[in-house]
Regions:
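Donor nucleotide-sugar binding/catalytic pocket of nucleotide-sugar-dependent glycosyltransferases
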Residues: 174-232
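A charged, aromatic-enriched C-terminal amphipathic alpha-helix characteristic of glycosyltransferases
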Residues: 60, 356-389
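Short hydrophobic beta-strand element within catalytic cores of glycosyltransferases
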Residues: 316-325
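Conserved donor-binding/catalytic loop of nucleotide-activated donor transferases
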Residues: 289-291, 309-316
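Aromatic "clamp/platform" in nucleotide-sugar-dependent glycosyltransferases that forms part
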Residues: 299
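Acceptor-binding helix/loop patch of EC 2.4 sugar-transfer enzymes
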Residues: 90, 153-185, 252, 329-331
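Conserved donor-binding/catalytic core segment of Leloir-type glycosyltransferases
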Residues: 51-52, 220-221, 226-253, 259
Length: 393
């Protein structure tokens, strides 16, 4: 793969959306190389209406949601995602090489024809569906709707999380850190929210904290394959509980705050601690099935796929949850969120208390597994999409 020099890399990192279109294309072509062979068109069931979900498949969610909808209805579903070098290799129906997505006009036009023949398209994270075929995703949505396609929106997180509002939700917000570069994030999130409101149509969010920024949205919970994460084997017996933390982006998870406190506990013989990095998604079930406690995130004030996977694997999950998220979950599901909520700087005392209560520890494990089965197995998510968009009552 060709590589940009330092100046080019920094330009892309600070936000290519601010650059002229011709310069964005030039830099990306240098970075990504030439487009390869155009992938073949997907094969779908012509007897069924088709739902297409794309183009990011964060944490494999597009794939899982599509399968859940297909299992719960008469619809066929297809997910696709842009293949990012160095990614986590999540399951997806179609993976598009990033160079093809960015530079292949043949693929872009082919994908436009494919999606124009679908009945429903769920656009993820306000990311363009066809590379640079159109100037922006608003033009894409209008083109699809002109072809008779029913388009809805699914926001995942930073795409609509407004920094100036997030700092009011939690004092641990990454956007409250000295030196935080919030300008682009503020601009991008507000632009995306304004665009989806201008376009109108159903809006879904994958985590309940995002309802703050789009109160009109419906929560479509992240979902997992329960069988993949659950294990019939008992946890290994050990003198000290194994605490793991698997930050995809350490700065955004509060790793820098909690780790010094975890190292103190480890030196005191209270816990064994492992930081999980660069582990393929296929290996993560084994990691969580071997762990006792999983530390999620301490800056967003919410929870996501990591917490759900860990609860399914029989771990107690600790993270920072805002009151708004706790209320939203209980209002939507009728049950309390079984994550131990903890301020980042209190992780030491919270873990000591948690470990000392063996009976309560076991109850939390069982509550977490029940919660995942009821809310995050895909059935709840499929109902959200079907009842509020695909098959409204």
């Amino acid at each position: 793969m060709n590589k940009l020099g330092g100046i080019g890399r920094r330009l892309i990192q600070v936000g290519v959306d601010f650059l002229p279109a011709w310069l964005r294309r030039f830099l990306r072509r240098i970075q990504l190389g030439k487009a390869g062979q155009v992938p073949a068109l997907p094969t779908t069931d012509p007897q069924k209406q088709l739902l297409v979900i794309g183009p990011v498949n964060y944490a494999g969610q597009g794939y899982v949601w599509g399968n859940a909808v297909a299992a719960a209805s008469d619809l066929a579903a297809h997910s696709y995602a842009v293949e990012v070098p160095g990614g986590f290799s999540f399951a997806v129906d179609s993976e598009i090489p990033v160079a093809v997505y960015e530079t292949s006009r043949a693929w872009q036009k082919q994908q436009l024809r494919f999606l124009s023949g679908a009945d429903f398209v769920l656009l993820e994270a306000e990311v363009r569906l066809f590379g640079n075929l159109f100037q922006n995703f608003k033009q894409e949505v209008r083109a699809l709707r002109a072809a008779g396609v029913n388009v809805a929106f699914l926001a995942h997180g930073t795409d609509i999380r407004v920094p100036s509002q997030h700092v009011k939700q939690t004092r641990w917000s990454i956007h409250a850190e000295p030196g935080a570069d919030n300008f682009r994030a503020e601009w991008l999130s507000r632009r995306n929210i304004a665009a989806i409101r201008e376009l109108t149509g159903p809006v879904f969010v994958s985590t309940p904290d995002l309802l703050v920024y789009t109160p009109e949205a419906i929560w479509c919970p992240v979902a997992i394959d329960l069988q993949r994460w659950r294990s019939d084997s008992p946890k290994p017996k050990r003198e000290r509980p194994l605490v793991v933390h698997a930050p995809s982006r350490a700065a955004e998870k509060g790793t820098d705050i909690i780790e010094p406190l975890l190292f103190e506990l480890e030196r005191a013989g209270v816990i064994d601690y492992q930081r999980i990095q660069n582990v393929p998604s296929a290996k993560m079930p084994e990691v969580y099935q071997n762990a006792d406690i999983v530390l999620d995130q301490f800056r967003a004030g919410s929870y996501g796929v990591t917490a759900v996977e860990a609860m399914a694997a029989g771990c107690v999950v600790v993270g920072h949850i805002t009151p708004q998220v706790e209320r939203a979950v209980e209002e939507a599901t009728g049950v309390s969120l079984p994550i131990v909520s903890c301020e980042a700087n209190q992780i030491g005392s919270v873990l000591r208390e948690l470990i000392s209560d063996q009976a309560g520890f076991s109850e939390r494990i069982q509550a977490g597994q029940r919660f995942v089965k009821e809310v995050h197995s895909g059935e709840f998510s499929a109902r959200a999409l079907l009842q509020n968009w695909l098959r409204p009552q």
